[in-house]
Curated annotation (Swiss-Prot):
Disulfide bonds: none annotated. This is Nucleoside triphosphate pyrophosphatase. Its EC number is 3.6.1.9. It is found in: Cytoplasm.
Length: 212
């Protein structure tokens, strides 16, 4: 019975979502060039497909390099991006880009899309795959100039999709959301449960203390 979930992500937030939900994931970070994967897709690729393909690339890269778990495990890859004005926005990386993003999205709403890929490994091979995308509408507040300065100086928004977090300092500047909160953080529990079921794994198998 599968009892190991390998998270193909360096995101502390994704790891914490799983831990809070009873799963202690094994963390393995892929070396996937996300920009190269996205650039290889046709220009008119739907946003949901873009994030799913990125999630699949991450999961596949990790699945190919975990011999110690390959006998029986599931590998989960995720990728999140913010869809605003018809354009996908990833991590800003610099304060200047993050400031420009906030100038664009403050006081408005945007859609946070998160691609998920679940691979089931058995006997060293991938025997099942399930993918899907979750979408959550985020309504942003208008930070005061000094608040935005402080937020950018914290460094938090530089390495997260859309230049904001829901579960950190950025939560002060989110008025409300429509959809799954865990998906905004980076890994949607309701969707992940369904995808695990699609590859034949019940979520309770993965809990630290299975229900009796």
């Amino acid at each position: 019975m599968t009892s190991t979930l390998v998270l193909a992500s360096a995101s502390p937030a994704r790891r914490q979502v799983l831990r809070a939900a009873g799963i202690d994931p094994v963390v393995r970070v892929s070396d996937v060039d996300e920009d190269a994967v996205a650039a290889a897709l046709p220009p008119d690729t739907a946003p949901a497909t873009v994030v799913v393909e990125l999630a699949r690339a991450k999961a596949a890269a990790v699945a190919a390099d975990i011999p110690e778990y390959a006998a029986d495990c599931v590998v989960v890859g995720c990728d999140s991006m913010l869809l605003l004005d018809g354009e996908l926005q990833g991590k800003p990386h610099t304060p200047e880009v993050a400031r420009a993003r906030w100038a664009q999205m403050a006081g408005r709403s945007a859609e946070l899309v998160t691609g998920h890929c679940v691979l089931r490994l058995r006997g060293g091979a991938v025997v099942a795959e399930a993918t899907d995308c979750s979408a959550t509408t985020v309504h942003f507040a208008k930070p005061e100039p000094e608040e935005l300065d402080a937020y950018l100086a914290s460094g938090e928004p530089l390495q997260v999709a859309g230049a904001f977090t829901l579960d950190g300092l950025g939560g002060w500047f989110v008025d409300r959301i429509e959809g799954d909160p865990s998906s905004v953080i980076g890994i949607g529990l309701p969707l992940l449960r369904r995808l695990l079921g699609d590859v034949g794994v019940g979520v309770a198998q993965l809990w630290r203390h299975p229900a009796r």
